């Protein structure tokens, strides 16, 4: 039986970018979780793009693993983009399809349904963003399978990163949780057509940083527990 099955494996953090000066609070959290003896893996969606880092970064022992970096989809036509990037994703799709055929089919169905729900107008094309997030989830699932020691996933920020994590959880069967912070839980465009509620329903728990945020998340109607972990200054911090 694998470590992931027995629940004694690693926690995989899924982040949009790492390390980031604007998100030192996340790096500090990772450092503190390591200090508690929790084994981690770090999976990062976007390539590192900052040269200056906070000092806490060097204290984190777990090294980040960056997901595949496709070309921009923002202004590209989806068929052309898929043709340009299929060679990058195809090996992971094949491996994941062999290991998790049902999970991959379910995740593809979730992504397709969301792409249709999130159309800006009834007659508009489905939102292509969710194709990209599905492929990123397949890449993540493939890496989790190869690692073989992850027991659960945790994402920071409740929009794109959590969508990728939710889909990867659907594929692999690993439980996931996420932390919601600010605009990622309040801005409808970032989680259109009820997406945030669906991700909450699928998660084992949700974390946020203020009581106002907790009340807002609770108002969405999900029964998933929402925990508050306040930001603060640790006056006893030792370098």
Please annotate each region the language model reported:
Residues 176-204:
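A conserved, positively charged/aromatic
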